[in-house]
A protein has these predicted regions:
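Short, contiguous pre-domain boundary segments
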Residues: 1-3
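Conserved alpha/beta-hydrolase catalytic His-Asp/Glu region
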Residues: 6-67
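Glycosyltransferase donor-binding loop in the core domain
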Residues: 7, 83, 110-113
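Residue-level signal for the nucleotide or nucleotide-sugar donor/cofactor binding architecture
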Residues: 10, 86, 116
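Conserved serine/cysteine hydrolase catalytic core
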Residues: 41-97, 102-105
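Catalytic active-site module of serine/aspartate enzymes centered on a nucleophile-bearing elbow/loop
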Residues: 99-133
Length: 133
């Protein structure tokens, strides 16, 4: 029931101010949070303001993904070392299913690696792409 209740705010400014990353991204700069918040707020049917995401996402159960073994292209998995969403074991399990998978752990980042340590993400992407035939 709690997941179906949406928190709304009287003004757009209130909603933007209350926007937070989930999971938290403590390394992300406040200016980035504010910029993303500006694009993540929408006006609801009742005229109040809420966040533009589907709350049903949080009720999707984890499941085995046997189709991963059929992915034949090189695949890069980026995992933030401090991620509370994707464990090291979970990332390795994904990588083990991908015939051409490569795992890179990003230090100084949780689940949202591209927000918390964009320089390390860029380096990992460049290295991955440079190694492609």
């Amino acid at each position: 029931l709690a997941l179906t209740l949406r928190r709304t705010y009287a003004t757009r400014a209130d909603a933007v101010r209350r926007f937070r990353f989930f999971p938290p991204a403590p390394q992300a700069p406040e200016t980035l949070r504010a910029a993303i918040a500006e694009h993540s707020v929408r006006r609801e049917a009742d005229g109040r303001y809420g966040f533009a995401f589907d709350p049903r996402w949080f009720s999707i159960p984890s499941r085995p993904r046997p189709e991963l073994s059929s992915v034949q292209c090189p695949t890069l998995i980026l995992r933030g070392r401090e991620s509370e969403i994707l464990s090291r074991e979970g990332a390795r399990a994904l990588m083990d299913e991908l015939p051409r998978g490569r795992l890179v752990e990003i230090s100084g980042a949780g689940h949202q690696t591209h927000l918390e340590n964009p320089d390390a993400v860029l380096l990992a992407l460049r290295n991955f792409l440079a190694a492609l035939p």
